[in-house]
Amino acid sequence: MNAQLCLDDCFCFDTSALSNMWTSDYRPAALPLVWNVLSAAIEVGAAIAPREVYLELERSRNTEMLKWMKQHRAMFQADTPELVAAVVALERDFPNLVEQDKEPYDADPWVIALAEMAGASVITGEKETGTRVGGMTKPRVKIPDVCRARGIRLASVSDFIEARNAAR
């Protein structure tokens, strides 16, 4: 996988972004057009997420969301040797990114690594902590902190919708 994965504006979604969209900010029953835009973006490879996001959302046991995820399985990218290596390197560079006691996994490094490999913007529900990253083990850093340190673009759901509407 490389930057050629994303031919247009590409967005890599974190678990918190999709969960917040579904349960509060952009509920499908209230804003079905948002989900139509997301579905269309998935079809052309402009909306992606790592498999680990799927696995985290699967634990939510939200049956309607699980049904949607299964219908849009193409969004969730399989692990590749390159992605695994990128995640290992990221966790080495940012040991305070992952909750060490989180079971069974933490999707955060996978989201960042996939976005970096694909040249995608990250959409997350997390807020920047302002913590300086690199070498520190405490306090825990969040996705926006690491993205800032690595020069990976951050975007909001509104940014995504606007970009996808402009791409039509």
Task: Locate predicted features.
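Short, flexible loop segments at the rims of nucleotide/cofactor-binding pockets, characterized by
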Residues: 23-27, 54-56, 98-103
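Acidic, PIN/NYN-like endoribonuclease modules and their adjacent C-terminal/linker elements
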Residues: 1-7, 31, 128-168
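A short acidic, often aromatic-flanked loop/helix-cap motif at beta-alpha or helix-coil junctions
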Residues: 55-56, 82-87, 151, 160-165
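PIN/NYN-family metal-dependent endoribonuclease catalytic core
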Residues: 12-13, 31-82
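Metal-dependent nucleic-acid phosphoesterase active-site entry motif
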Residues: 1-33, 49-52
